């Protein structure tokens, strides 16, 4: 099974599939060379990006991520403030130190190719890395796929049409929403309780709790950074940061908040904008479950901790565990990759997870939590991924804010009912998968349709 820490991982913006994944793949390739004693034989490297990676790689920073990964950087620890200077130095010098130890000639314009119209068979986000010796002979070639949320699968697993599963036995295995509800009925556990029992299969309960609270800390720090920085986002669209200005407006608002019943929603919008502006700027974020949708769960969690009486760290833990359980269902039965199923797989999944998490934290029954997740996804079906300029800015940043409000609405609506509803979460996940399969490629993170072409034409 997938762990909650696979779904919530610390990384770098602007994209989990297009930045975090390529960085991990590149680092894995050169680390493998070193492990086999081949790294010092390398004189030249070649990297190729295909499909959605090739089409929007420049806007998503995929090319930069590959350079950093080859140099040994890891998404969870790379110095985000030093990325620009490090990449610029590689480009200016035409030299790259593999794993920061073995230096070779590397000209990005020659040795790093983005194929805008070519795809590999398994997944739209394909990469090929090759290493050569001083005689030009190939030392090793490997193919990797970035399948969403920072997950990377190599060619062998892709050929088996699956990611190699973790064989660690968990206490309460489940692959569908129906199975999850059956487990809760049989054990009397909440959804977060089931997930916690499973997480203990990998690490101690104390480590699970500490790890999740650390994830929450990184989310809070991301919001704080986003709320403190003005200016224009990189990439050429001249998108202005709005979170800092909105925060100042809310903090100095002379209008009595009690006079506006929707005042809290402005704060939720702020929290989401802050995260996604940081993500667009290449800052430190938590995949939740992807970078493109990274603002939704932190925004709804901030809503819970700041505006719900009696909110606690225990509630935060229940929120993240329940959200993770729903994320497992999307990852196992559909996709969280915009390049595979459109934005319904990213923002839709995150909205569903956040709705479930909030319903859990507010004391919902398993049936109500499942209902909240279903509502959150149902009303994101068909959502396209059409980033203007191939950047994770328009419509992505505002879309996270809107989905955060939608997640809160879904949770509150579910909690007003008894959990009985006409459409199951499993049916909605199946529908999302089928809708994504039917969706044209131009609406799946290629910047060749929708807003990506109409905004520029206007």
Predicted segments, located by residue:
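Conserved phosphate/anionic-ligand binding catalytic regions in large, soluble enzymes, centered on
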Residues: 8-26, 281-300, 343-352
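C-terminal regulatory domains involved in ligand/effector binding and gene-expression control
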Residues: 75-256, 267
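Extended hydrophobic packing segments that form well-structured cores
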Residues: 422-458
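Short alpha-helical scaffolding segments that buttress acidic/His motifs in well-ordered protein cores
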Residues: 8-11, 268-276, 319-327, 372-376, ...
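Hydrophobic alpha-helical bundle architecture
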Residues: 311, 322, 329-401, 413-422
